[in-house]
From Swiss-Prot:
PROSITE patterns to which the protein is assigned, alphabetical: G_PROTEIN_RECEP_F1_1, G_PROTEIN_RECEP_F1_2
Keywords of the record: Cell membrane, Disulfide bond, G-protein coupled receptor, Lipoprotein, Membrane, Palmitate, Phosphoprotein, Receptor, Signal, Transducer, Transmembrane, Transmembrane helix
GO molecular function, one term: peptide hormone binding
Source species taxonomy: Eukaryota, Metazoa, Chordata, Craniata, Vertebrata
Lipid anchor positions (S-palmitoyl cysteine): C402, C404
Biased composition (Polar residues): 54-70
Signal peptide: 1-26
Family: Belongs to the G-protein coupled receptor 1 family. Endothelin receptor subfamily. EDNRB sub-subfamily.
Source superkingdom: Eukaryota
This protein's name: Endothelin receptor type B
Pfam families: 7tm_1
Gene3D superfamilies referenced in this protein's UniProt entry, alphabetically: Rhodopsin 7-helix transmembrane proteins (1.20.1070.10)
Residue segments, region Disordered: 30-87
Length: 441
């Protein structure tokens, strides 16, 4: 039998390769006609395909199945006035069936691995008292947000890609993007809180505690969920179902409505891509870079004055810091292609450029690779914890392999020893502080 780390590593490589193949398959297709929209599996939203008009059905000029020349607007047009839309892109407009199947397989793998990994992670932290500390509770909050997204969003988005028509009603049309944005918000804010927590743990040695959840961590988790839900409300308000004519068929499409009723929602629709890129991608990277730099400087400054008895405790803190950094790195790698595709379209796309079709084809490939990579982020955190953290690896082995009758009984000897070391280090540090206090007085 192959060792479990090898199997996890191979499964992870297979998932990433599948995401790339899905993007390559998407490259072999061109764009659907104006008015058609494509579902974004794993993002909980619909994206208007890159056509020459933003409102579905407004013009048939970009439909390759229509006449070769653009239609003249009703009432004709005056001489000397150029047409409103450039010539259409040539090529087929069908989505490759192979891409649909590959995307479905990737979504099913994410669904299965995500449910198993995140539910196991929650069970480990809930059952094992040694794992109930501030950073792990934040990781549990992150896993719970991913689990909600996996259970609700991924099946619906997969069905949406295969069926094209939206059959679930207005309520689900608003709920799916709301949960998706709330889940990403929980992930982003949890990673920020973990990075700040690692710096505070190094900078304030009086905060050393063995087992238990600090009150401030509980307040942080409540704030993270409340802020994430509030920031996701515009998605529920703005998304709606519209009816579009597509080759003689009326399709119900769930998307961010092109015409919003309020000035705020119109501004949100206009600035959405930049808002998502800045808050949901750049913020956790900037926070992590800032506080990990401060943490490194603090550890180098205090290195000479640290007591040898605290070495085991410092090793545990370095492992936690390495784990948090790994989670942030995985998040950045998974979400970079999708955000890069959207930003490139906003900054470089010109509908009057004669080479726009090739550029849109490249963006479409990048977009679909990004969609699958973003979905992968919902299931990859437990795998990353297993590969990086020895403590989580032991707990995952005990919980998944079922070596004993119950989780409490099968807790490894190494975990018990780590708990004893944790308490002993705290006691040793208290004695160290007391001796310094009396010696200074």
């Amino acid at each position: 039998m192959q060792p479990l780390p090898s199997l996890c590593g191979r499964a992870l490589v297979a998932l990433i390769l599948a995401c790339g193949v899905a993007g390559i398959q998407a490259e072999e297709r061109e764009f659907p006609p104006a008015g058609a929209t494509q579902p974004l599996p794993g993002t909980g939203e619909m994206m208007e395909t890159p056509t020459e008009t933003s409102w579905p059905g407004r013009s048939n000029a970009s439909d390759p199945r229509s006449s070769a020349t653009p239609q003249i607007p009703r009432g004709g047009r005056m001489a000397g006035i150029p047409p409103r839309t450039p010539p259409p892109c040539d090529g087929p407009i069908e989505i490759k069936e192979t891409f649909k199947y590959i995307n479905t397989v990737v979504s099913c793998l994410v669904f299965v691995l995500g449910i198993i990994g995140n539910s196991t992670l929650l069970r480990i932290i809930y059952k094992n008292k040694c794992m109930r500390n501030g950073p792990n509770i934040l990781i549990a909050s992150l896993a719970l947000g991913d689990l909600l997204h996996i259970i609700i969003d991924i099946p619906i988005n997969t069905y949406k890609l295969l069926a094209k028509d939206w059959p679930f009603g207005v309520e689900m049309c608003k709920l799916v993007p709301f949960i998706q944005k709330a889940s990403v918000g929980i992930t982003v804010l949890s990673l920020c809180a973990l990075s700040i927590d690692r710096y505070r743990a190094v900078a304030s040695w009086s905060r050393i505690k063995g087992i238990g959840v600090p009150k401030w961590t509980a307040v942080e988790i409540v704030l993270i969920w409340v802020v994430s839900v509030v920031l996701a409300v515009p998605e529920a308000v703005g998304f709606d179902i519209i009816t579009s004519d597509h080759i003689g068929n009326k399709l119900r499409i769930c998307l961010l409505h092109p015409t919003q009723k309020t000035a705020f929602m119109q501004f949100y629709k206009t600035a959405k891509d930049w808002w998502l890129f800045s808050f949901y991608f750049c913020l956790p990277l900037a926070i992590t870079a800032l506080f990990y730099t401060l943490m490194t400087c603090e550890m180098l400054r205090k290195k000479s004055g640290m007591q040898i008895a605290l070495n085991d405790h410092l090793k545990q803190r370095r492992e936690v810091a390495k784990t948090v950094f790994c989670l942030v790195l995985v998040f950045a790698l998974c979400w970079l292609p999708l955000h890069l595709s959207r930003i490139l379209k906003l900054t470089l796309y010109d509908q009057h450029d004669p080479r726009r079709c090739e550029f849109l084809s490249f963006l479409l490939v990048l977009d679909y690779i990004g969609i699958n990579m973003a979905s992968l982020n919902s299931c990859i955190n437990p795998i990353a914890l297993y590969l990086v953290s020895k403590r989580f690896k032991n707990c995952f082995k005990s919980c998944l392999c079922c070596w004993c009758q119950s989780f409490e009984e099968k807790q490894s000897l190494e975990e018990k020893q780590s708990c004893l070391k944790f308490k002993a280090n705290d006691h040793g540090y208290d004695n160290f502080r007391s001796s310094n206090k009396y010696s200074s007085s």
